[in-house]
Curated annotation (Swiss-Prot):
Pfam families: YbaB_DNA_bd (PF02575). Binds to DNA and alters its conformation. May be involved in regulation of gene expression, nucleoid organization and DNA protection. Residues 23-45 are annotated as: Disordered. NCBIfam families: DNA_YbaB_EbfC (TIGR00103). This is Nucleoid-associated protein Cphy_0047. The keyword Transit peptide does not apply. It comes from the Bacteria. It comes from Lachnoclostridium phytofermentans (strain ATCC 700394 / DSM 18823 / ISDg). It is found in: Cytoplasm, Nucleoid.
Amino acid sequence: MAKRGGFPGGNMPGNMNNLMKQAQRMQKQMEDKTKEMEEKQWEATAGGGAVTVTVSGKKEVVSVKLSKEVVDPDDIEMLEDLIVAATNEALRKMEEESASAMNSIAGGLGNFGGLGGLF
C-alpha cells in the first residue's frame, strides 16, 4: 500500500524546521518574560496620594498604604472607593506593561493563525 501525504523519511522541509525552531525560541522568550514580569511590582495612588497600592506581576496586592488624613470613621465608603481605584490603576499598569512586553516578542507573528491579538 502506497504511503500518502507526509514527507519522505518523515523529515520536515527546511522552512518548516526553521519555523519550529523560531516558535520554540519565541516560547522560551515568552516564558522568560512572564517570569520577569511576575517578579516586578507596580504602584498607583488615589486621592492625591492618600492611598497607595502596590501589586505584583502575579496580580496580587503586595501593600496598601493609607495617609492618616484619609482615615475617617464617618466616611469609610470614601476610603473603600480610594482603595479600589488605586488597586485597579495598579493592575491596569501591570496589564499594560505585560501586554506590551508580550507584543514585542510575538509582534513578528502579525495575525499568524489568529494568534496576533492574544498578547
